[in-house]
């Protein structure tokens, strides 16, 4: 079995079926995906990097005429390019959870008061009797692990907020659970600690079958970076509560023109989005 080197330095077996599954998720037909997997299988060699394999797959999707699937295949890279200075990842997660039935708020003001100190919360999500405090941990390098310290701090934050609420502290909230959301993955110790302390983790392919990537794909709520928008363009959109491609698709053309998008370009972008969210569309 050919060994490949993952971006975090770990060694793994080459898995042809993973290629098929990932291509299918991107929207290509199973027949095309099988051909691409065969092609890659013929090109891999001992010690090849997973990054080189991803580049091969992306290129083969393009040359096979599946340009929209090729765009979707770059989802992980697009998420990593969200800009921390304009809090894109936090806003993106805030909007994503709304599709899941939550009422969400980013960085509530005034800060949430605990028993001991006040706390800046990335996202507060409410659904029925559930009130969740969420820490959004974004990494530019998509092989960077989120370590033990993050869920430990989040559990301590929840403990203090719960204490503040029980004491009737002003600006407290009735927090019922704590989450950490990251665009990469977690260290083994972070996972073990979170299971023990009931801190919910969401990451790329974690929990298995219900990870952040599956959630994005289920709702077709792709980031604005996936359609090639520049940082200054995305900043204008974020300031107008447009956080993902679905928001942009629904945006009024007059608003888009006012913030610098000519009608013709706005329509081209919306046409691209329509194809991305509906792979079967011609």
Q: Can you say where each PLM-predicted feature lies in the sequence?
A:
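Residues marking the start of alpha-helices
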Residues: 10, 24, 182, 225-226, ...
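RNA-recognition motif
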Residues: 34, 108, 251
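Short leucine-rich amphipathic alpha-helices used at interfaces
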Residues: 3-5, 9-12, 203-205, 211-213, ...
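Short Gly/charged-rich anion-binding patches and loops
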Residues: 18, 92, 189, 232, ...
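Intrinsically disordered, low-complexity Ser/Thr/Pro/Gly-rich regulatory segments
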Residues: 31, 57, 61-221, 238-241
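Long, C-terminal-biased catalytic regions of enzyme "large/alpha" subunits
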Residues: 1-82, 89
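Compact, charge-rich alpha-helical regulatory domains located at protein termini
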Residues: 209, 214-282
